[in-house]
Amino acid sequence: ENRTINYFLDDINNLQKIKPNSYDAIFNFAILHHATELDNAMKKLSDSLKPNGLIFNEEYVGPARNQCTDKQLNIMLEVMSDLPKRFQSKHHLRPPLANFRVEPTEAIHSDLVISTFKKYFDIVFERNMNGGIAYQVLWNNIEEFENPNDIEAEKWLEYLLEKDTKFSNEGKVSVLFWYSVGKSKITSYK
């Protein structure tokens, strides 16, 4: 079926442009964790899909305000201490709460994204993308790992990703990123 693609941007915290029962697809890239009224936003998104419409998400779903537990922080610090100095992050692995004055909606309800999503959408596909260690170490530190000819960088990047997968799968660190495809529970009954 030929369909015209119409797209627009809207503010997740008020969604003034969105219309009910109107969209074949919604694409979300890391905006739901900024929703101050997450339940309201999810309901509006769900209402806006046509009966066979899908929502595609790549989203931050880690701890609210990026505040991991002390136990998780210690695991991150332990893994990072294994790295040579040049690969270690110079930034806080758990950011001070004062940092959120700059962007007050950053990760405001990120820990509720998955459960709220599942309240309004049936999961068609989902995959945890981990990140509980690797993202924290690589964030603002990726340049040391970017040279494709640097064998040492490749080795330590693989090490980070292995530890990230291991500790995420064991539930010892939070999964920070989640990919999902969902179908509205509301529109699926229309």
Residue ranges and their predicted role:
Residues F8, F27, F56:
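Conserved Rossmann-like nucleotide-binding pocket used by diverse enzymes
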Residues P84-F145:
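Substrate-binding/catalytic lobe of Class I Rossmann-like enzymes that use SAM or dcSAM, i.e.
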Residues D24-L38:
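A short SAM/SAH-binding and catalytic strip from SAM-dependent methyltransferases
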Residues Q16-I26:
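A short acidic, Gly/Pro-enriched loop at the edge of an enzyme's catalytic core
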